[in-house]
Amino acid sequence: SFSTPEGIDFRLLEQEFVALLDLENLDQQVTQTPHRVEALEAAIAAALTLAYGDTSKPGNELAHWFLQRILYRINRLNLFWYDDLQHYKNERSLYLQWLRDRIESAWQAWELGQIDVDDLKQQDVQQTLRDWYEADLNPPITENRRFLREDLDREGYRWLLAITSLDGLVEASRMSRILGGASNSVQAMLIRVLMEEYGNGRLSRKHSTFFAKMMAEMNLDTTPEGYFNLAPWQLLA
């Protein structure tokens, strides 16, 4: 369902949140003028109930969309976009951290409700990982995959590239931020994987460069986040 509680405009409140990110001393302003964020916090509270209130249900689509876009706006501050440094002045904001934790704690509980934990406990972890590895190497031909391979036309391909460009044009791999720590063989292998994805230090060989070339061939905008509004909440998550 795309219905929302009467009087709450998630799209408008997302834009108000974006404006908050550019405030000087955001934490101080929230403390001194709490009414500034009352509507936003009320919308987040309502969205949390709509999206994650019942772990047995998929939740409200627009609520998911709103919450994931809020999280995206917060988390993107951890990456450098080669723009004005003033855009990062609130990257260490305690208020933003509180909002993120509030949303993610409810989201994680809802996600856990979608998983049969007892069944997972009975599985052989190593064998399960091997099975997942094999499935990644040789994925089954589902109805959706068959459509993409056999029936997708040029315009459909352009749409697919535009939607996935939110990820394809940006290097946001979590791997690059978890490789620190004691040296070990697993870390060494992960570094090899990371270097391959980053073109071994050559811009022309980076995966994002190849993706941009594919988009250019389809006459699409290659600006990072250029098609942000096309992205479904599942992609943001």
Q: Where are the language model's segments positioned?
A:
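Non-heme di-metal
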Residues: S1-A237
